[in-house]
Regions:
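Conserved beta-strand hairpin/beta-sheet module of binuclear metal-dependent hydrolase folds
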Residues: 1-47, 136-146, 151
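Short Gly/Pro-enriched turn/cap motifs at secondary-structure boundaries
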Residues: 8, 106, 126-128
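Hydrophobic residues at beta-strand termini and immediately following loops
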Residues: 10, 109, 198
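A short acidic, often aromatic-flanked loop/helix-cap motif at beta-alpha or helix-coil junctions
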Residues: 15, 112-116, 214
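Short, glycine/acidic-enriched loop or turn micro-motifs at the edges of active sites
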Residues: 23, 33, 59, 91, ...
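Active-site neighborhood of phospho(di)ester-bond hydrolases with catalytic His/Asp-centered motifs
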Residues: 29, 50-58, 64, 85-88, ...
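Active-site HxH/HxHxD metal-binding segment of metal-dependent hydrolases
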Residues: 34-121, 203-204
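Metallo-beta-lactamase
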Residues: 97-100, 121-126, 131-221
């Protein structure tokens, strides 16, 4: 399947595109910034946008108001191409309120749902903590983690909808079964490298160090 996989990091790794090279179908992940340019970029590769996956509702991933600056994001993309926007069910109302994307454009998912883009499967994993409906996308040994997990650290848990206890459960349970050879691609580059294998991240990232929930919350809850 790897030979068919289309995988591209866009805009310094903030946005991603995944798809099937043989069918030319692609999904955009978190197209907040310059969505028309994102479409143009993958069309140069002879790919066509068939849908959007949002890891969570924040403006720098979905579009909306960020510190007084409005990011058109997904809403602008839908003005160019009418495609479904795949979100975790718990995130739907947050996405609509924050980004302005209408509910009719959203497809709500549960954890474990698999999207098909051509013959490529994209598994959606509910990973609450940073937001109620944060989700990661797992495709062909690559985990697109949004703001759930970074190579160094994890998403903030002091924002509207955040829950430190849920973040602990996400890191220690919901993502625990993923193979250590899985490549982590976070939604922000806060480390020297843009990606790392989960085995390395588990070894070096302090938020994944073995500790009880009480210890973790006392150390990282903020």
């Amino acid at each position: 399947m790897t030979e068919r996989l289309y995988f591209r990091q866009l805009l310094a790794g903030v946005d991603f595109a995944v798809g099937d090279r043989e069918t030319g179908d692609a999904l955009l992940i978190d197209p907040a910034y310059r969505p028309r340019e994102l479409i143009d970029a993958i069309e140069v590769d002879e790919m066509t946008v068939r849908g959007v996956v949002l890891t969570h509702y924040h403006a720098d991933h979905a579009g909306g108001n960020l510190a007084g600056h409005y990011i058109k994001g997904t809403k602008e993309l839908l003005e160019t191409t009418d495609v479904p926007v795949h979100v975790q069910a718990a995130e739907s109302p947050w996405v609509t309120e924050a980004s302005g994307v209408e509910r009719r454009s959203l497809v709500a998912h549960e954890s474990g749902d698999v999207l098909r883009v051509g013959q490529i499967g994209v598994t959606l994993i509910h990973t609450p903590g940073h937001t109620p409906g944060s989700q990661c996308a797992l495709v062909d040994g690559r985990l697109l983690s949004g703001d759930t997990l970074f190579i160094d650290g994890c998403g903030r848990t002091d924002l509207p909808g955040s829950d430190p206890a849920e973040m602990y459960h996400t890191l220690t349970s919901r993502l625990a079964d993923l193979d250590g050879t899985t490549w982590l691609y976070p939604g922000h580059r806060y480390a020297a490298e843009p990606t790392a294998q989960l085995g390395v991240v588990r070894r070096d990232n302090a938020v994944l160090a073995p500790m009880t929930a009480e210890q973790w919350l006392a150390t990282f809850s903020r």
